[in-house]
UniProtKB/Swiss-Prot annotation:
Residues 433-469 are annotated as: Disordered. Its EC number is 5.2.1.8. Keywords: Cell cycle, Cell division, Chaperone, Cytoplasm, Isomerase, Rotamase. This is Trigger factor. It catalyses: [protein]-peptidylproline (omega=180) = [protein]-peptidylproline (omega=0). It comes from Synechococcus sp. (strain CC9605). Belongs to the FKBP-type PPIase family. Tig subfamily.
Amino acid sequence: MSAAALKVTTEARPSSRLAVTVTVPGERCKTSYEDAITSLSRSINLPGFRKGKVPRTVLVQQLGGVRIKATALEKLIDNAWRDAIQQESLEPISQPDLSSGFDGLLESFEPGKELTFTLEADVAPTPKLKTTKGLKAEFETVAYDASRVDAMIEDSRKQMATVVPVEGRAAQNGDIAVLGFKGTYTDDGSEIEGGSADSMDVDLENGRMIPGFIEGVIGMKVGETKTVDCQFPDDYPKEDARGRKASFEIELKDLKTRELPELDDEFAKQASEQETLADLRKDLEQRLKDDAERRQTSNRRDALVAALVEQLEVELPEALIQQESRNLLEQTAAQFAQQGMDVKSLFTPDLVRNLMQNSRPEAEERLRRSFALTALAEAEDIKLDDKAVDAKIKEVKKELSADAKIDPERLRQAVMDDLIQDRLMGWLEENSTITEKAPAADDSKAEAKKKPAAKKAEAKSKSKADAKD
């Protein structure tokens, strides 16, 4: 079908949608109908007729005019859409939707008569920034915590400790208690689901169990049985247990403790690739300092981009939101797969729907950040030159092993993404006002509990000591 025969008008719609109204001449409608009859006659099997030799009148009688018209209309719409976007140089990013609905259009479709219909599709948005200069951003500082070095070393000592039986004394903090216990709710006497064990190793450290449990075990002797009263915290994961009082019948069946290795150069050699304890400390200190600096830089950049996003004007198309949500879902699945989980059985249709829905806010935020930076590059004409890209690629290749398999195009794109990101952030740094603020007290406690700095440092450290944290 010739695209020149179409009449096409376009109209922008909210959420980066484009309405494309197409008027198809009667001749094309008739041709589509005749093509549908020919196609169906070749594919249908009717008793007494060879395939492709079914008379027209018999075919219409057997299939009905509606089915033939529907087949013709489907093909007509597909061809008209393809020709219209080519004729008008349109770039949709989603499949089109028929505004009036197929059934309504089918009623008005007559072979040989002109037909007008409107299709809507998502198109790439045009992001704009209200302003680019003079932005104000505030970010949280990240301080190097020297106490983490000692904590990491102590954790490594625990990993390398020898577990030995305890004799002649009661249980105390830091011991490993072998417990048998049974828990019931105080209010109705019902058993606590998952609140019983015949023999379970429990580290006697505060925070390991619900409040009151560890404290109740401290001071017990092997063979002793004791009733301990506890209370579930209000934020306990299991909803029906929150805030409820409980009673546990506890028997201390055995008691063990850890004999930690001496904190000396020999320990450093066994726990890491360092020769001395001093070298181990120095290595951990530097890695934690580097990590704190990286996280502070990340906080600074996040604050600048957040300030830029506030100036962004863009309507996100649904197609991009869905695609970004799928990207996040695939990342989650990949993480689970790396942990050895069976992703196919885990990701049920219901779970996928929930994850897609829950990831939508993050998907939208990521898109806004991306569009804000794209708009900044456009507004301020921030570009890359080939020499800088080539130089960076050579630098990256030097750090890779000789036998590493590299996709040149993917490497170049990754390098370009990093370089343009650096240039955009550098421009924002120079043209914005940035102030520091100390982390909130509660956030500091949460950070200390989660130990993200240590975990990141340990993951990159060559030492076994920090890798075991």
